[in-house]
Amino acid sequence: VLSAADKGNVKAAWDKVGGQAGEYGAEALERMFLSFPTTKTYFPHFDLAHGSAQVKGHGKKVADALTNAVGHMDDLPGALSALSDLHAYKLRVDPVNFKLLSHCLLVTLASHHPAEFTPAIHASLDKFFASVSTVLTSKYR
């Protein structure tokens, strides 16, 4: 459960991301594909080369979903219900992949905002991404 302090930390961190959210989403996806090659199996139709339009496009979708989640931290299940359905029933993404992407998002944010990436911010973002992952995998049961 996200505390009030966690929610404030997440909001502050995401505000720093600003207009680069889509770029960071794409970078996190590239990190995931390079670090965890099995994740590529869900994107057989994508050009996974560095800077590809498809990875950038999906990175923007990831970032938009996270921006939506940041704006609805008090109702993540409601805010992410359609996305949860999509990933569980249509795409059938292995739930572990959300954890892998979460890790890559943390690394990406830390690399771009090292001064702001304090232990408290890190912990709050980690809890937030875990909460989002839990909601996205809730329909698998």
Swiss-Prot record:
CDD domains: Hb-alpha-like (cd08927). One of its GO terms (biological process) is hydrogen peroxide catabolic process. Keywords: Acetylation, Heme, Iron, Metal-binding, Oxygen transport, Phosphoprotein, Transport. Residues 1-141 form the Globin domain. Pfam families: Globin (PF00042). GO terms for cellular component: blood microparticle; haptoglobin-hemoglobin complex; hemoglobin complex. O2 binds at H58. The modification N6-acetyllysine is found at K16. The modification Phosphoserine is found at S3, S35, S102, S124, S131, S138. The modification Phosphothreonine is found at T108, T134, T137. One of its GO terms (molecular function) is organic acid binding. Heme b binds at H87. Red blood cells. It comes from the Eukaryota. SUPFAM superfamilies: Globin-like. The modification Phosphotyrosine is found at Y24. Involved in oxygen transport from the lung to the various peripheral tissues. Belongs to the globin family. Heterotetramer of two alpha chains and two beta chains. This is Hemoglobin subunit alpha. It comes from Macrotus californicus (Californian leaf-nosed bat). The gene is HBA.
